[in-house]
């Protein structure tokens, strides 16, 4: 079967003809290309399906034979330098290829209907196809140079798609923010690659790992320099996977179309950082300090993402912060050395998160029939509510995805998340406590999203939620309050830390008041939606078309069953752990003397604890967000909380602190804006002044002085010989006078 591997080089290039042909068609035959636009969507899906089938065949071959195949072409060779390009087919490559293709195919099918009203339909599919090509090229790369090339292409495509509606200033700003933030990590990655080449003299993974490990083992290289290079490599993953402190671009990236949000969060851009750390893990494991840094950054991101999600009203931003938190779990697992567990959670999270984002896109699409094109309203959860009877299939999809991400068995994320939580006890009890606490917090805010969206009544016709906003740069808490606009204010460090809201937070909604229902027209005439304004406007949302529902149903099946590939049981006559066989040999620092299998009793005891925490978070969410007419509302219990006196005041203060922290994004964006952005701008203005006034001023001063001296001499001479003779005799007389008397 080795001949199968010989043709694996076509994997990244099969989707490439679509963007090339779309570009050529729009250049030479624009009318025909636009009229036949759905053919290009069909071509994108068909070519990607071929890649998926080929990847599956390679994966089956690797499961059966545990083979690794690498093919290289020499690009340049001389005495001191050699550079080769090729492809590497190993378990990590096959897993990522299958993950990318399956999710991307479903997203493309979904996008055909979701983007049908957009004049940028062809541009969207061209970007998406090139995005898939770049990501497939990244995961099949055999050396760091190829990794970096495709790494930059993945970033470029993501910027294009985040700023897809570039005529909206908010989307353009989000694109710039993603670009600038990722520049920091990408520059670190480039420096790390160059540093490793200086140490090892190779870019190829196999040679690099072997040489680097030998140098470290024999103490033949400066350890501080090795730590620095490894940290710079990790910095690239921190930015790409939205880890603290370079996470600030991810929530704003939701300004792009919802299908690309699903693809970015499930299987492409943010997964690229996890893939890079997994690929370079043999290099990181020989440097314990870097492993500590990876796990520490991971656990901070886990907690930070969960707390920042609490006060969001925008459904896509809430899911974005959840993605950030789950990526932190994966990074924590890699830092602990649980290679298999991290990849397992990457797989299960990808399908569950794609399901949630596509379901949220269906909701946004349906809400658009009421509010028109207005992201401030169509994505606002507190304007939703009571959608169960209007969008039952979407509701079921969202509920299954929510239960999976909360860690409820037997759904996919339960199996992988539970393994990470168990491994965290072995690694660090403090990290384990934070991880378990965040698991409960995750269940709370995920069910908050579900209850605000689907339970109760449609709140768009009520006034008790502040739904009208001037821009999308706001975050509204679960209590329906505006976030302070701190970014454009002049604030000091003291004000930054003591930032507060003037209104008082409350868990409970106020009495609803009816408002005058008026469906506004499109607020932004420059948006490329042609006839959405005048058609399909109704008083209530309705279920999406079958083209959008089909991917949801397929993702439900993945969410239900994909977790079973990694069940860690190995009893008599039963060998269910396909993932471990697939990843053989793999790295596991926490269980180096075991076979990664546990018995039923140990598994059940650990699972009961994590499930109990998840159900506790769900119960708290139901307690606060279940509709007021629900039988689950215990008003005696609620009133008992309202009569606590001093304890009530303390509780309200704690709630306000949590709200302010979450609504202001942990003050991190404000800190960057105040001290970094303004500081850099002030420094650049100072440098510009020094350059223009000092550096350029010196030669300009000499030039101006010479000009005026020459002009003065010209007017003094006047062009007459008698004047020249007079001045000549005058200067000679003065010279003789001075010489005589000195």
Swiss-Prot record:
Catalyzed reaction equations? a plastoquinone + NADH + (n+1) H(+)(in) = a plastoquinol + NAD(+) + n H(+)(out); a plastoquinone + NADPH + (n+1) H(+)(in) = a plastoquinol + NADP(+) + n H(+)(out)
**Which terms does the record give in the GO molecular function aspect?**
NADH dehydrogenase (ubiquinone) activity; quinone binding
Q: Which GO terms describe its cellular component?
A: chloroplast thylakoid membrane
Which parts of the chain span the membrane according to its record? 9-29, 39-59, 91-111, 125-145, 147-167, 185-205, 224-244, 258-278, 280-300, 327-347, 354-374, 396-416, 425-445, 549-569, 603-623, 721-741
Q: What is its main location?
A: plastid
Entry keywords, A to Z: Chloroplast, Membrane, NAD, NADP, Plastid, Plastoquinone, Quinone, Thylakoid, Translocase, Transmembrane, Transmembrane helix, Transport
Which cell locations does it reside in?
Plastid, Chloroplast thylakoid membrane
Q: How does it sit in the membrane?
A: Multi-pass membrane protein
Q: Which GO terms describe its biological process?
A: ATP synthesis coupled electron transport; electron transport coupled proton transport
N-terminal signal peptide: none
Catalytic activity, EC? 7.1.1.-
Q: Assembly and interactions?
A: NDH is composed of at least 16 different subunits, 5 of which are encoded in the nucleus.
**Family per similarity comment:** Belongs to the complex I subunit 5 family.
Q: Per its database record, what is this protein's job?
A: NDH shuttles electrons from NAD(P)H:plastoquinone, via FMN and iron-sulfur (Fe-S) centers, to quinones in the photosynthetic chain and possibly in a chloroplast respiratory chain. The immediate electron acceptor for the enzyme in this species is believed to be plastoquinone. Couples the redox reaction to proton translocation, and thus conserves the redox energy in a proton gradient.
Q: What is the protein name for this chain?
A: NAD(P)H-quinone oxidoreductase subunit 5, chloroplastic
């Amino acid at each position: 079967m080795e001949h199968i591997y010989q043709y694996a080089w076509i994997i990244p290039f099969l989707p490439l003809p679509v963007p090339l042909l779309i570009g050529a068609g729009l250049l030479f035959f624009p009318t025909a290309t636009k009229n036949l636009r759905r053919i290009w969507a069909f071509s994108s899906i068909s070519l990607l399906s071929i890649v998926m089938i080929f990847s599956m065949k390679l994966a089956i071959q690797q499961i059966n034979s545990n083979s690794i195949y690498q093919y290289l072409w020499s690009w340049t060779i001389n005495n001191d330098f050699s550079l080769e390009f090729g492809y590497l087919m190993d378990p990590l490559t096959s897993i990522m290829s299958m993950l990318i293709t399956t999710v991307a195919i479903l997203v493309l099918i979904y996008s055909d209907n979701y983007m049908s009203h957009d004049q940028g339909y062809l541009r969207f599919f061209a970007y998406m196809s090139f995005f898939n090509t770049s990501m497939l090229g990244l995961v099949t790369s055999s050396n760091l140079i190829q990794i970096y090339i495709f790494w930059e292409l993945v970033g470029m495509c993501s910027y294009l798609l985040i700023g897809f509606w570039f005529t909206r200033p908010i989307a353009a700003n989000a694109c710039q923010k993603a670009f600038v933030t990722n520049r920091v990590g990408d520059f670190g990655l480039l420096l790390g690659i160059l540093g490793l080449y200086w140490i090892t003299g190779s870019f190829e993974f196999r040679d690099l790992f072997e040489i680097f490990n030998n140098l470290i083992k024999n103490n033949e290289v400066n350890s501080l320099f090795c730590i620095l290079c490894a940290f710079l490599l990790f910095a690239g993953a921190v930015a790409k996977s939205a880890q603290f402190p370079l996470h600030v671009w991810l929530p704003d990236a939701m300004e792009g179309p919802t299908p690309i949000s699903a693809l970015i969060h499930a299987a492409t851009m943010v997964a690229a950082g996890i893939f890079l750390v997994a690929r370079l893990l043999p290099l990181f494991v020989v440097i314990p300090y870097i492993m500590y840094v990876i796990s520490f950054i991971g656990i901070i991101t886990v907690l930070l993402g969960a707390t920042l999600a609490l006060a969001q009203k925008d459904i896509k931003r809430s899911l974005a912060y959840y993605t950030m938190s789950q990526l932190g779990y994966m990074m924590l697992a890699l830092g602990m050395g649980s290679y298999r567990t991290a990849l397992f959670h990457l797989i299960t999270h990808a399908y569950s998160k794609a399901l949630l984002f596509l379901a949220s896109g269906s909701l946004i699409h349906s809400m658009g029939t009421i509010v028109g094109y207005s992201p401030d309203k169509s994505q606002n959860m507190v304007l939703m509510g009571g959608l169960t009877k209007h969008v039952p299939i979407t509701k079921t999809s969202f509920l299954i995805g929510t239960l999976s991400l909360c860690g409820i068995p037997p759904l996919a994320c339960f199996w992988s998340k539970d393994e990470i939580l168990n491994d965290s006890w072995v690694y660090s009890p403090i990290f384990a406590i934070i991880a378990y606490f965040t698991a409960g917090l995750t269940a709370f805010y995920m069910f908050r999203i579900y209850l605000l969206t689907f339970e109760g009544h449609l709140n768009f016709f009520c006034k008790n939620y502040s739904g009208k906003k001037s821009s999308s740069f706001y975050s509204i808490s679960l209590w329906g309050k505006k976030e302070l606009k701190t970014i454009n204010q002049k604030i000091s460090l003291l004000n930054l830390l003591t930032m507060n809201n003037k209104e008082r937070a409350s868990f409970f909604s106020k009495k609803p008041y009816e408002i005058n229902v008026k469906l506004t027209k499109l607020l932004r005439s420059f948006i490329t939606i042609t006839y959405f304004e005048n058609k399909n406007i109704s008083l209530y949302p309705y279920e999406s078309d079958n083209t959008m529902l089909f991917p949801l149903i397929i993702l439900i099946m993945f969410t239900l069953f994909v977790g079973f590939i990694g069940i860690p049981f190995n009893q008599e006559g039963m060998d269910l752990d396909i993932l471990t066989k697939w990843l053989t040999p793999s790295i596991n620092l926490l269980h180096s003397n075991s076979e990664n299998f546990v018995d039923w009793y140990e598994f059940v005891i650990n699972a009961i604890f994590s499930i109990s925490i998840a159900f506790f978070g769900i119960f708290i969410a139901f307690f606060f967000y279940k509709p007021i007419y629900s039988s689950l509302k215990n008003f005696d219990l609620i009133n008992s909380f309202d009569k606590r006196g001093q304890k009530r005041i303390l509780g309200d203060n704690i709630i306000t602190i949590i709200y302010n922290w979450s609504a202001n994004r942990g003050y991190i964006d404000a800190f960057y804006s105040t001290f970094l952005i303004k500081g850099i701008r002030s420094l650049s203005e100072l440098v510009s002044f020094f350059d223009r006034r000092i550096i350029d001023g010196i030669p300009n001063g000499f030039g101006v002085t010479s000009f005026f001296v020459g002009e003065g001499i010209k007017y003094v001479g006047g062009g007459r010989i008698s004047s020249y003779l007079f001045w000549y005799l005058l200067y000679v007389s003065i010279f003789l006078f001075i010489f005589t008397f000195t």
